[in-house]
Amino acid sequence: MLTPMVAGGVVFPGLFLLSKNTLQRLPQLRWEEADAVIVSARLVSSVQAIMASTAGYIVSTSCKHIIDDQHWLSSAYTQFAVPYFIYDIYAMFLCHWHKHQVKGHGGDDGAARAPGSTWAIARGYLHKEFLMVLHHAAMVLVCFPLSVVWRQGKGDFFLGCMLMAEVSTPFVCLGKILIQYKQQHTLLHKVNGALMLLSFLCCRVLLFPYLYWAYGRHAGLPLLAVPLAIPAHVNLGAALLLAPQLYWFFLICRGACRLFWPRSRPPPACQAQD
């Protein structure tokens, strides 16, 4: 178990540092540290997402029996990804800190900042990214132990499908980069926004009904009968995982309304949301 976790603890921070230093030091680029940190953090998140979704696809398509079939990659990648969530909490804080500095709320260097300003930035970070930090902490403290201990080698198919939820992450990361650099008017941003909306809907929101349907097909049950046929704690866990996805999907839909129908002429649906 330790080998994949150690590997993850080296790969993700190492990739971040490599990307940041490359963007800062290449003569053709010479990016500012803030820009290099933000883009590097998004790059690492995208790489992790591609790796996770690829592993998930391999596992889910290899498990013909959705309960009993096993694939070594399910446990190996789960262990490998644990350090990513810990790293990403810190990487998100670095992005928030640099954005705070760029906006002019801090001094030009660390010594120039007022006492307590770092704590104020940390509180602002936790306030703004509370749900994401909570999600990452739950992945490490709850989901990982459950996947290793409670599953007892069962349900690799379902774990593979859950890993494929990361398909939407590269589009989310690219969208954030384009917004950060005021590229909302570009065709790339609009195409990426449409792909982000579609991938998030299919791979994160509709994923849960699909998993219930897959189990119902395996057990010979109609979809609506599945929640009553499985343990209550499974339904509770699915609801807790689905809830933040629905919230984030709402934010994506609201952003899509503002992108494709500016406020000067919003459609009735957007007016109702505003």
UniProtKB/Swiss-Prot annotation:
The keyword Nucleus does not apply. Keywords: Cone-rod dystrophy, Disease variant, Endoplasmic reticulum, Golgi apparatus, Lipid biosynthesis, Lipid metabolism, Membrane, Transferase, Transmembrane, Transmembrane helix. Its EC number is 2.3.1.-. Expressed in testis. Expressed in the retina with higher expression levels in the macular than in the peripheral region. It is an enzyme of class 2 (transferase). PROSITE patterns: TLC. Residues 34-261 form the TLC domain. SMART domains: TLC (SM00724). The chain crosses the membrane at residues 130-150, 159-179, 194-214, 223-243. Pfam families: TRAM_LAG1_CLN8 (PF03798). It comes from the Eukaryota. It catalyses: sphing-4-enine + octadecanoyl-CoA = N-octadecanoylsphing-4-enine + CoA + H(+); eicosanoyl-CoA + sphing-4-enine = N-eicosanoyl-sphing-4-enine + CoA + H(+); sphing-4-enine + hexadecanoyl-CoA = N-hexadecanoylsphing-4-enine + CoA + H(+). GO terms for cellular component: endoplasmic reticulum; endoplasmic reticulum membrane; Golgi membrane. It is linked to Cone-rod dystrophy 22: An autosomal recessive form of cone-rod dystrophy, an inherited retinal dystrophy characterized by retinal pigment deposits visible on fundus examination, predominantly in the macular region, and initial loss of cone photoreceptors followed by rod degeneration. This leads to decreased visual acuity and sensitivity in the central visual field, followed by loss of peripheral vision. Severe loss of vision occurs earlier than in retinitis pigmentosa, due to cone photoreceptors degenerating at a higher rate than rod photoreceptors. PANTHER family: CERAMIDE SYNTHASE, CT120 PROTEIN. This is Ceramide synthase. The lineage of its organism: Eukaryota, Metazoa, Chordata, Craniata, Vertebrata.
